[in-house]
Amino acid sequence: MNPLIAASSVIAAGLAIGLAAIGPGVGQGTVAGNAVEGIARQPEAEGKIRGTLLLSFAFMESLTIYGLVVALALLFANPFVGA
């Protein structure tokens, strides 16, 4: 295995998971804060807000999981390594 390809793959895997976690992390914090504000303003809508909140958390977390899959593929099933 070419050392340059190996080093580039490790750096790319680290960037993939790191950058894939930043966006959803910021988004989840923002959404949770807005949900708390919404529940404080309208306590009777708590169930509807909570359901929407959990669904949006699942969509945001899927982006992080996709980044993890890309990182694992770069580390263990690297398509750039010659056979």
Curated annotation (Swiss-Prot):
Belongs to the ATPase C chain family. In plastids the F-type ATPase is also known as CF(1)CF(0). It comes from the Eukaryota. One of its GO terms (molecular function) is proton-transporting ATP synthase activity, rotational mechanism. PANTHER family: ATP SYNTHASE LIPID-BINDING PROTEIN, MITOCHONDRIAL (PTHR10031), ATPASE PROTEIN 9 (PTHR10031:SF0). GO terms for cellular component: chloroplast thylakoid membrane; proton-transporting ATP synthase complex; proton-transporting two-sector ATPase complex, proton-transporting domain. InterPro entries: ATP_synth_csu_bac/chlpt, ATP_synth_F0_csu, ATP_synth_F0_csu_DDCD_BS, ATP_synth_F0_csu_sf, ATPase_proteolipid_c-like_dom, F/V-ATP_Csub_sf. F-type ATPases have 2 components, F(1) - the catalytic core - and F(0) - the membrane proton channel. F(1) has five subunits: alpha(3), beta(3), gamma(1), delta(1), epsilon(1). F(0) has four main subunits: a(1), b(1), b'(1) and c(10-14). The alpha and beta chains form an alternating ring which encloses part of the gamma chain. F(1) is attached to F(0) by a central stalk formed by the gamma and epsilon chains, while a peripheral stalk is formed by the delta, b and b' chains. It comes from Oedogonium cardiacum. The keyword Hydrolase does not apply. HAMAP family: ATP_synth_c_bact. It is a multi-pass membrane protein. CDD domains: ATP-synt_Fo_c_ATPH. This is ATP synthase subunit c, chloroplastic. F(1)F(0) ATP synthase produces ATP from ADP in the presence of a proton or sodium gradient. F-type ATPases consist of two structural domains, F(1) containing the extramembraneous catalytic core and F(0) containing the membrane proton channel, linked together by a central stalk and a peripheral stalk. During catalysis, ATP synthesis in the catalytic domain of F(1) is coupled via a rotary mechanism of the central stalk subunits to proton translocation. Key component of the F(0) channel; it plays a direct role in translocation across the membrane. A homomeric c-ring of between 10-14 subunits forms the central stalk rotor element with the F(1) delta and epsilon subunits. Keywords: ATP synthesis, CF(0), Chloroplast, Hydrogen ion transport, Ion transport, Lipid-binding, Membrane, Plastid, Thylakoid, Transmembrane, Transmembrane helix, Transport. The keyword Amino-acid biosynthesis does not apply. The chain crosses the membrane at residues 3-23, 57-77. The record marks E61 as: Reversibly protonated during proton transport.
